[in-house]
């Protein structure tokens, strides 16, 4: 299944249609019923190249398509007459990419989900998951050649590789920059006029060396951690949000906006930073600002594991390294604290 499943069976809302239970080969009903089902194709990898003259653009996706059929006869009787083969679903990904192009994970997922619902009347629900590979255009200054401290013959432009001009972008060369993963989930149900569009950020790893504290927490017989007035704060952010309105929405710009908001609330001003009294507070400020800035977002969920960096104790080694140590730390990724919260506008029903 998908890394981020959207829907879980809800027993309270589940209504079993009459005669939905399976029949055996003698026409007698089984004593069990299928309460959830579906099938699909996962890990379909596609690269789309947009060739606009000499300037090319690329999108590389990993796509999963899952369908839920009205009928369960493929399970109960082994009757495959309603099955849209997973190989056909794979082909659909490539053919729609060829026919319509690829602009963003969300738009492509919506295109695929609508296709399955519109083309196959026996499909009850279509769920599409897309993960975007983080390619960025190479800066021209990164392609200059330097030999023995001098520019190679025939190479024009600045050969100072310590300074990269981000405005000079290469026409057709790209570099893989896995800072964070952009993914989305789209669910369209034939009986529900509202489509579900969820976008997410996965694996955004950040660290700051000061302006983080953790003090005045519960002090009892189980506590061993002292108050920390200045510590290293590092986390790997996973975040997802649901759109209530996608009309004329620039999905790529919205995703970048959320990412920038998270980084800004974590890091603060480049010169002075921002104080983080707890991971919880930083997380909440990020979520609140997303809802303030993007009215199309109805609910946002975020997880921030606390990746610890502990001071190496130099006290037993004063002859070798005298004085206090605030420069050498031991990274400890396990065990780690995990902080999460979901922030929603009032009176919102979410699929997060």
From Swiss-Prot:
<feature type="compositionally biased region" description="Basic and acidic residues">
    <location>
        <begin position="23"/>
        <end position="32"/>
    </location>
</feature>
<dbReference type="InterPro" id="IPR019842">
    <property type="entry name" value="Uricase_CS"/>
</dbReference>
<feature type="binding site">
    <location>
        <position position="279"/>
    </location>
    <ligand>
        <name>urate</name>
    </ligand>
</feature>
<feature type="binding site">
    <location>
        <position position="86"/>
    </location>
    <ligand>
        <name>urate</name>
    </ligand>
</feature>
<comment type="pathway">
    <text>Purine metabolism; urate degradation; (S)-allantoin from urate: step 1/3.</text>
</comment>
<dbReference type="GO" id="GO:0006145">
    <property type="term" value="P:purine nucleobase catabolic process"/>
</dbReference>
<feature type="region of interest" description="Disordered">
    <location>
        <begin position="1"/>
        <end position="32"/>
    </location>
</feature>
<dbReference type="GO" id="GO:0019628">
    <property type="term" value="P:urate catabolic process"/>
</dbReference>
<dbReference type="GO" id="GO:0004846">
    <property type="term" value="F:urate oxidase activity"/>
</dbReference>
<feature type="binding site">
    <location>
        <position position="280"/>
    </location>
    <ligand>
        <name>urate</name>
    </ligand>
</feature>
<comment type="similarity">
    <text>Belongs to the uricase family.</text>
</comment>
<feature type="active site" description="Charge relay system">
    <location>
        <position position="308"/>
    </location>
</feature>
<dbReference type="GO" id="GO:0019428">
    <property type="term" value="P:allantoin biosynthetic process"/>
</dbReference>
<protein>
    <recommendedName>
        <fullName>Uricase</fullName>
        <ecNumber>1.7.3.3</ecNumber>
    </recommendedName>
</protein>
<feature type="short sequence motif" description="Microbody targeting signal">
    <location>
        <begin position="350"/>
        <end position="352"/>
    </location>
</feature>
<keyword id="KW-0659">Purine metabolism</keyword>
<comment type="function">
    <text>Catalyzes the oxidation of uric acid to 5-hydroxyisourate, which is further processed to form (S)-allantoin.</text>
</comment>
<feature type="active site" description="Charge relay system">
    <location>
        <position position="41"/>
    </location>
</feature>
<dbReference type="GO" id="GO:0005777">
    <property type="term" value="C:peroxisome"/>
</dbReference>
<feature type="binding site">
    <location>
        <position position="87"/>
    </location>
    <ligand>
        <name>urate</name>
    </ligand>
</feature>
<feature type="binding site">
    <location>
        <position position="306"/>
    </location>
    <ligand>
        <name>urate</name>
    </ligand>
</feature>
<feature type="active site" description="Charge relay system">
    <location>
        <position position="86"/>
    </location>
</feature>
<dbReference type="InterPro" id="IPR002042">
    <property type="entry name" value="Uricase"/>
</dbReference>
<keyword id="KW-0560">Oxidoreductase</keyword>
<dbReference type="Pfam" id="PF01014">
    <property type="entry name" value="Uricase"/>
</dbReference>
<feature type="binding site">
    <location>
        <position position="214"/>
    </location>
    <ligand>
        <name>urate</name>
    </ligand>
</feature>
<feature type="binding site">
    <location>
        <position position="231"/>
    </location>
    <ligand>
        <name>urate</name>
    </ligand>
</feature>
<keyword id="KW-0576">Peroxisome</keyword>
């Amino acid at each position: 299944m998908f890394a981020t499943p959207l829907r879980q069976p809800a027993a309270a809302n589940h209504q079993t249609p009459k005669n939905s239970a399976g029949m055996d080969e003698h026409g007698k009903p089984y004593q069990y019923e299928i309460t959830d089902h579906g099938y699909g194709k996962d890990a379909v990898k596609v690269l789309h190249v947009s060739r606009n003259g000499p300037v090319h653009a690329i999108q590389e996706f990993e796509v999963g398509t899952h369908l839920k059929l009205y009928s369960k006869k493929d399970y109960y009787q082994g009757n495959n007459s309603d099955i849209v083969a997973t190989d056909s679903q794979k082909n659909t990904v490539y053919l729609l990419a060829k026919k319509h192009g690829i602009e963003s994970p969300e738009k492509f997922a919506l295109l695929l989900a609508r296709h399955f619902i519109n083309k196959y009347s026996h499909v009850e629900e279509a769920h599409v998951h897309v993960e975007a590979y983080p390619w960025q255009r190479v800066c021209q200054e990164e392609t200059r050649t330097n030999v023995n401290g001098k520019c190679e013959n025939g190479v024009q432009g600045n050969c100072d590789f310590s300074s990269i001009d981000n405005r000079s972008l290469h026409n057709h060369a790209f570099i893989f920059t896995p800072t964070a993963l952009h993914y989305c989930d789209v669910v369209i149900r034939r009986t529900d006029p509202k489509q579900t569009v969820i976008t997410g950020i996965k694996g955004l790893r950040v660290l700051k060396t000061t302006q983080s504290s953790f003090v005045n927490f519960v002090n009892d017989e189980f506590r061993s951690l002292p108050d920390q007035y200045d510590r290293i704060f590092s986390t790997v952010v996973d975040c997802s949000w649901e759109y209530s309105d996608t009309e004329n929405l620039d999905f790529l710009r919205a995703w970048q906006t959320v990412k920038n908001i998270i980084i800004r609330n974590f890091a603060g001003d480049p010169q002075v930073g921002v104080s983080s009294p707890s991971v919880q507070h930083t997380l909440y400020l990020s979520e609140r600002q997303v809802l303030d800035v993007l009215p199309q977002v109805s609910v946002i969920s975020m997880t921030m594991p606390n990746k610890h960096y502990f001071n190496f104790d130099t006290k037993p080694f004063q002859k070798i390294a005298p004085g206090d140590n605030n420069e050498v730390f031991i990274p400890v990724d396990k065990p780690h604290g995990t902080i999460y919260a979901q922030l929603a506008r009032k009176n919102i029903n979410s699929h997060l």
